[in-house]
C-alpha cells in the first residue's frame, strides 16, 4: 500500500460561512468585498477594511484620534469601565467605536465616519458623539458631503449614563444644521 505525502496547506486560505456553513476560499470572499460566493452572506467588515473599500487608496486622514473616553460614573459591571476600554482598544486596535476624517471617493473630497460594532457594540459614548458631531460640523464648514457608515447596534453606552444619552441630541443637531444647508448626507 502506498501513501501520498500530505501537502502542507497554509493557514487562512479557507473560511466557514456563517450563513450557509460552506467552506469557501477566502480570496473569493475578499474579491466579493467580504460576501460569501455561495449564499451572499455578508461577513463583518472592519473599520480599516471599510475605509479601504469605500475611499480612494491612501486618501483617508483621520481626525480626533487622541480623544479618549472618561469614566465620570466610575462605572463597574463585571469589570471597571476604564479597564473595559483598555481591553477593547487592545482587542480592536481602535481608540473608540467611531473613526472619522476626510478622504476622497473617485477624486471627490468627503468627510467620512464609521462606527465599529466590535468596540463595545459600536455604542455611543461621549467620544463617539463628539467625533460624529465634529465631523458633521467640519463637513458643514467645508461644504463637503458627509458619509457615515454605522456599524452600531449598542445604542447609548450605559457606562457613561446621561453623558452618553446627551450625545444623541448633539449629533442630531449637528446633522440637522447640515441638512438645513442642503448638503449631501449619506448614512
Language-model segments: which ranges?
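Terminal-region recognition feature
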Residues: 1-186
Amino acid at each position: 500500500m502506498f501513501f501520498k505525502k500530505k501537502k502542507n496547506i497554509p493557514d487562512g486560505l479557507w473560511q466557514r460561512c456563517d450563513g450557509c456553513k460552506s467552506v469557501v476560499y477566502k480570496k473569493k470572499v475578499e474579491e466579493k468585498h467580504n460576501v460569501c460566493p455561495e449564499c451572499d452572506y455578508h461577513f463583518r467588515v472592519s473599520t480599516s477594511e471599510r475605509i479601504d473599500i469605500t475611499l480612494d487608496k491612501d486618501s483617508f486622514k483621520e481626525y480626533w484620534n487622541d480623544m479618549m473616553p472618561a469614566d465620570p460614573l466610575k462605572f463597574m459591571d463585571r469589570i471597571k469601565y476604564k479597564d473595559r476600554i483598555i481591553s477593547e482598544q487592545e482587542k480592536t486596535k481602535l481608540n473608540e467605536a467611531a473613526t472619522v476624517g476626510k478622504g476622497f471617493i473617485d477624486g471627490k473630497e468627503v468627510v467620512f465616519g464609521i462606527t465599529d460594532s466590535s468596540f463595545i457594540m459600536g455604542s455611543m459614548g461621549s467620544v463617539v458623539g463628539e467625533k460624529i458631531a465634529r465631523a458633521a460640523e467640519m463637513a458643514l464648514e467645508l461644504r463637503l458631503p458627509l458619509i457615515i457608515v454605522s456599524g452600531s447596534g449598542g445604542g447609548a453606552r450605559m457606562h457613561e449614563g446621561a453623558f452618553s444619552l446627551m450625545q444623541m441630541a448633539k449629533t442630531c443637531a449637528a446633522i440637522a444644521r447640515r441638512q438645513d444647508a442642503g448638503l449631501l448626507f449619506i448614512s
